[in-house]
């Protein structure tokens, strides 16, 4: 966006860059995604809701450094006083689909965007647990340069995205 290669971008983080306009268009929350096993079904079905501390010893797969999801997860961990040293991190992956397949195949759990796992949740291939803190919501933004005049078709796309998600 800044170098003019693209007119706009859809991003998961507001970098607060003064030369850009950030328009929130979609809100999402982070969830704990787990395989469907007896252990996680028991957690899901117990009377008291599962909390993140119930998952501390479980094998966890992280997103790569620089990922917006990873940054939001780091903020969540910081707010709850948990460090990565407290977790059983078994892998760091830069491909969301690989993480999802790893979860389905029982390799571990992960903290992911609820929208990114809706397909697997609908088909009952995973279980999802909410994070207990209210401050784990994430916004997505349309971003474009303040220094560029948007073409009519780009403005139309921005309006379409806003109408679709809002």
Where are these regions (language model features)?
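Hydrophobic hinge/microswitch elements
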Residues: 2-6, 11, 78-127
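Short Pro/Gly-enriched coil loops immediately N-terminal to beta-strands
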Residues: 22-36, 52-56, 131-139
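Secondary-structure junction motif
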Residues: 50-52, 59-81, 151, 158
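Short helix-loop capping/hinge motifs at secondary-structure junctions, enriched
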Residues: 37-51, 147-152
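Short beta-strand-centered segments that line the small-molecule binding cleft or hinge
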Residues: 1-34, 42-44, 104, 127-129
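A late-sequence structural motif
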Residues: 127-166
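Alpha-helical segments flanking ligand/cofactor-binding loops in enzyme cores
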Residues: 23, 53, 100-101, 155
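Short acidic active-site motifs
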Residues: 20-21, 50, 97-98
């Amino acid at each position: 966006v800044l170098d003019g290669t693209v007119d706009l971008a859809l991003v998961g983080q507001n970098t607060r860059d003064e030369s850009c306009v950030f328009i929130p268009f979609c809100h999402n929350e982070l969830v704990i995604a787990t395989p469907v096993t007896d252990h996680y079904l028991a957690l899901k079905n117990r009377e008291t809701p599962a909390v993140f501390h119930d998952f501390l010893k479980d094998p966890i797969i992280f997103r790569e450094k620089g990922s917006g999801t990873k940054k939001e997860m780091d903020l969540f961990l910081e707010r709850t006083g948990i460090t990565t040293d407290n977790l059983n991190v078994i892998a760091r992956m830069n491909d969301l689909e690989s993480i999802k397949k790893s979860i389905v195949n029982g390799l571990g759990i992960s903290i992911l965007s609820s929208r990114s796992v809706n397909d697997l949740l609908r088909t009952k291939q995973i279980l999802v647990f909410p994070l207990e803190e209210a401050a784990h919501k994430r916004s997505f933004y349309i971003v474009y340069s303040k220094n560029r005049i948007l073409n009519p078709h780009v403005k139309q796309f921005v309006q379409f995205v806003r109408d679709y998600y809002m």
